[in-house]
Amino acid sequence: MANEFYALISRMRYITRWGLMRNSFSEKVQEHSHMAAVLAHGLALIRRDILGLPGPDPDRCAAAGLYHDASEILTGDLPTPVKYFNPEIKKAYKQVERVSGDKLLSMLPEALQPSYEHLIQEDDPETLPIVKAADKLSAYIKCVEELKAGNQEFESAARQTMQAMEAMGRPELDYFLREFLPAFSLNLDQLE
């Protein structure tokens, strides 16, 4: 059998997020994963270099961000309201994600599987909190961009996502929200 892992990973570009929402512009899982990786790397650097707190390696956080939604290649993107509708559905979906992750890992040569396991299965206790924060932050940035484009459909999602981020109690995330997030509301001319 051919090693199909990377061919499947490349298909993240076809999976659309926010499927239940009217979007001004679509966002694919690949785009979201890239932004989550950038943000996870940045949050880990803020934690270490600005706040002086211990934490995971920023490069490991970036890699984990790239693969955090890889299981969606096989499952598709299940909308958040469905995914978290009740504890039973949440638990069942976690199991589906685990099985999908196992399937992806099986498509790698055995020698590579241990290096990818924590990235695909999101079970590294060091990087997971940073990646979860980056994932929420990426979702919030999408909401900001949609609201900036006049799409009020994202108003509730923005509010709920901000509340979830504030509840995380992550100082590096709080720093980012205070110091970097306001720039996402600017237009191109204002950014220069």
PLM features per residue range, with description:
Residues M1-E192:
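Alpha-helical, largely C-terminal catalytic domains
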